Amino acid sequence: VLDAMIYIKENMDKTLTFRGSCRMGTCGICGLVINGKPRLACETQILLLNTDTIYLEPLHNLPLVKDLIVDHIPFFEKQKKIKPYLIRNDMEEYWNPTREYLQTTEEHLRYMQFSYCLTCALCYAACPTTATNPSFIGPQALMNTYRFIADSRDEGKLERMAIINNPDGCWGCHLAGACS
């Protein structure tokens, strides 16, 4: 789909505005709603959509900037709330480490799949709770909270749990499953 959008911009409508960067599904910036489903434009193959007509929309649940571009700031502000970095209790050791914080394979596997998130906001756009409650922290922030809680090197579990333990955090999720 991204190649088709580039073709349209170069040959048919130079005013069409969208985002695209890596063209291989690693940056997440080309997220759109394609035929009603949030997808990455660079990863979505037109032939596999099995239709003659393709409808493109900007991601839902985020403010529109122009055409197919949305403002990701509300999404990233919610991610920032959960402190998406390793928290250590000993700040001297944190800033001047005396050793590596090694992990076993099992410890790494506990959170590995959650570390692959592109922060593309597709889950956020698909979430019916985010659509009806702008204060809801969203699926990406909840997933990222778990990613750090499950990391054996992190000591911020209680701090993060306090952030999401409320109606706009984990208790606000209606378990619709649209995010996955």
Question: What residue spans do the PLM features occupy?
Answer:
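A generic structural motif
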Residues: 45-46
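Short, structured protein-protein interaction patches enriched in aromatics and acidic/basic residues
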Residues: 22-31
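Short strand-turn-strand beta-turns centered on an Asx-Gly dipeptide
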Residues: 33-36
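Short beta-strand-centered aromatic/proline hotspots
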Residues: 42
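Active-site phosphate-binding and catalytic loops of NTP-dependent enzymes
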Residues: 13-19
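Extracellular interaction modules
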Residues: 49-53
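Ferredoxin-type iron-sulfur electron-transfer modules in oxidoreductases and energy-metabolism complexes
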Residues: 1-11, 57-180
